[in-house]
Amino acid sequence: MTAPIFGLLGRKLGHSWSVPIHAALGCPDYRLIELEPEDLPAFLQQENLGGLNVTIPYKRDVMPYCDVIDPQAQAIGSVNTLCRRSDGKLCAWNTDAAGFSYMARRAGISFAGQKVVILGSGG
């Protein structure tokens, strides 16, 4: 069996700190995966996908290839986390909303009763 693939999927990832961050966290096999759009379907069909973070421009493009999409990610309309389960299903989540909420709470910001505009949807 081929080693599982772990990494950040996107285009033009030279600015990313993901590899050194994951290495520091004990994940030495994490890598940057830069693909052209036409290569995305074949890549996502690989059975040895372990786990991926997904960034632009593929946060929406990967969704049709996912077998299971978290309801919150479905509502947001984009995903940023993929995992191939042991049954072969490709599952997807969006951690942007939870991360944003956590950051706001840590900063002491409450949106309760407030009108808020968020530009973009993480895609």
What are the language-model segments listed below?
Residues D96, G122-G123:
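Short acidic/polar capping segments at secondary-structure boundaries
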Residues T2-I109:
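Phosphate/diphosphate ligand-binding glycine-rich loop within oxidoreductases
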